[in-house]
Amino acid sequence: MSDYIVVKCGGSMLNQLNDVFFECIKKLQQKYKVVIVHGGGPEIDAKLKDCNINVEKRDGLRITPKEVMDVVQMVLCGSTNKKLVMNLQKHNLLAVGCSGCDGNLLQIQPVSEEIGYVGEVSYVETALLKGLINMEYIPVIAPIGVNGNEIYNINADNAAAGIAAALGAKELVFITDVDGILHEGNLVKETDESEIATFIETGVITGGMIPKVQAALASLKMGVQKISIVNGTKDFTEVTGECIGTTVTKGVSIA
């Protein structure tokens, strides 16, 4: 068991996770060293509404002034993270929840002043993750990062891709509520960058699948070798540890 695998679970999926999901994580842990990264968008939006703070986004990123950052940190590092940790442990999967600010795990580069405390991963302190895994814990990471003495919000896709690239992970798995990319009703088991562009142009990929594949493409650019888009409400792992869904790779360069 030498290869790492990073599992990214968006905030909209956290309340849909069932026993099947946790059994899949058990199967993955038998073959790989597992790291989980989670989001928390719906919970953050709800808490901001409770606090009478407007929810604003630009180009898919949450505009995060200081008062929003305080709420983001509270939700991601608090209730959301610990709920997932407790669900894992309920299924006999030992987990440790932490955020990217713990041990300077996720160091970031700010995106722009206009959107506030939002950053993209620039460095990952992998020794912390490896230490937890060597003690047989599953690290459960909230996507908060640091720059100097300031805490920043990180898009969970970017956080997961940064961690996967830094660990040299075998695979980054995006947990969704669909089986993968479908073409004429059939699952596309393997695809690459150029074919995805064609799928979008021809309308094979539409709606909510577009941001999922865009996240996969962005992960490839960050150095991740293989991304799988799977349905977290079903059994998405073979006994071999391979994922059932759509696998995205860079493809072959003819340059």
Curated annotation (Swiss-Prot):
Locations listed in the record: Cytoplasm
GO cellular component: cytoplasm
Key words, A-Z: Amino-acid biosynthesis, Arginine biosynthesis, ATP-binding, Cytoplasm, Kinase, Nucleotide-binding, Transferase
Bilayer-crossing regions: none
Pathway: Amino-acid biosynthesis; L-arginine biosynthesis; N(2)-acetyl-L-ornithine from L-glutamate: step 2/4
Family assignment from sequence similarity: Belongs to the acetylglutamate kinase family. ArgB subfamily.
Residues the UniProt record annotates as site (Transition state stabilizer): K8, K212
Enzyme class: transferase
Entry-linked CDD domains: AAK_NAGK-like
Residues noted as binding substrate in the record, renumbered to the chain: G40, G41, R62, N153
Its job: Catalyzes the ATP-dependent phosphorylation of N-acetyl-L-glutamate.
EC number, UniProt record: 2.7.2.8
UniProt xrefs under SUPFAM superfamilies: Carbamate kinase-like
A biological-process GO annotation: L-arginine biosynthetic process
GO molecular function: acetylglutamate kinase activity; ATP binding
InterPro entries given in the database record: AceGlu_kinase-like_sf, AcgluKinase_fam, ArgB, Asp/Glu/Uridylate_kinase
Reactions this protein catalyses: N-acetyl-L-glutamate + ATP = N-acetyl-L-glutamyl 5-phosphate + ADP
Organism encoding this protein: Bacillus cereus (strain ATCC 14579 / DSM 31 / CCUG 7414 / JCM 2152 / NBRC 15305 / NCIMB 9373 / NCTC 2599 / NRRL B-3711)
Protein name: Acetylglutamate kinase
Keyword hit for Kinase: yes
Gene name per UniProt: argB
Entries under Pfam families matching the protein: AA_kinase
